Amino acid sequence: MSTNLSNAEILNNLLEGRDLDELTSRALMQRWLNDEISDVETGAFLSALRAKSSTGVELSSMAKELLNVCELPVARPNLYLVDTCGTGGDGANTFNISTAVAFVAASCGVKIAKHGNKSASGKVGSADVLLNLGLNLNCSLEKVINAVSEIGITFLFAPVWHKSLIKLAPLRKTLGIRTVFNQLGPLVNPLRPNAQVLGVASEDLLQPMGSALLNLGMNRAIVVHGSGGLDEASLQGKNKLVFIENGELRFSEINISDFNHENIANENLVVSDLDSNEEILKSVLNGSGQKSHMDVVALNVSLVLWAAGIEDNLNEGFNKALFSINKGDPWKKFLLLKNYLSAN
């Protein structure tokens, strides 16, 4: 994959607001991976892409290059896999909803391959809270992959699988802005899931992320931007959705009031630190949590059940999720995964 354009020419196109085609987007990512772009150029590229806004073609093309260099140590399980990884970065400091969603969905029969990382901009990322709960993220990659067949859920810690991007981390941190790599994270799950629910922190990302998932061959997916700016479906009001199905994008909205529940402000979902995040996550999974916490998780699980093809009716999916939560099945699923990853 190559292009005759120099780094300077590609950068100039971006600065003039021109979108990159697939060939150029893939070539740009290859140059990053091959250390053919300096730190100064990287800062300029990331800033220019941010200012222009990345397209679905740019995102999916770069994601393909990242996936091409991500080799699996064992064969991918022949299962219909679903991911709940989003962009993060909404700055709302809510408890880690997508992680709770993953375990609840798994307890409802969805095969979950959860891709995640440490915090993007909030206080706690999925890896942070799972590490605090004692999940072993340093076991063999073979065991990580096999867990989805044995337990029905696994967690893929992004830095372990995408080591080529570690060298960019200090520069991204120095820039202090959200970049295209925040958007690429949810698109580069090494197990290449068949379906996904992908939360975005900005409404402007709904269409490009939906198009990217479509370009990557996703069977079914939902991109969601929550009321009040969450990168999850929110209890606060109208949530914007893009459904990906049959090769098409369909825009829609849902409100918790559609499920005969009252709207609740996002402030009720805020946590102050890692320990309180852990406490809330555990209480949701074992069925002893606050109603608002369990409801917001169930709402998002209903989207996962749709993506998995288990329940097309979101209201029914919501009730199915609450039933599983109230039985404490998600916590049992977490303990099974914890024990499996810790065993010799």
From Swiss-Prot:
One of the GO biological process terms: L-tryptophan biosynthetic process
Positions contributing to Mg(2+) 2 binding: 231-232
UniProt EC number: 2.4.2.18
Keywords linked to the UniProt accession: Amino-acid biosynthesis, Aromatic amino acid biosynthesis, Glycosyltransferase, Magnesium, Metal-binding, Transferase, Tryptophan biosynthesis
InterPro entries recorded: Anthranilate_Pribosyl_Tfrase (IPR005940), Glycosyl_Trfase_fam3 (IPR000312), Glycosyl_Trfase_fam3_N_dom (IPR017459), Glycosyl_Trfase_fam3_N_dom_sf (IPR036320), Nuc_phospho_transferase (IPR035902)
Similarity comment: family membership: Belongs to the anthranilate phosphoribosyltransferase family.
NCBIfam families in the cross-refs: trpD
PANTHER family registered for this protein in UniProt: ANTHRANILATE PHOSPHORIBOSYLTRANSFERASE
Assembly description: Homodimer.
Descriptive protein name: Anthranilate phosphoribosyltransferase
Protein species of origin: Prochlorococcus marinus (strain MIT 9301)
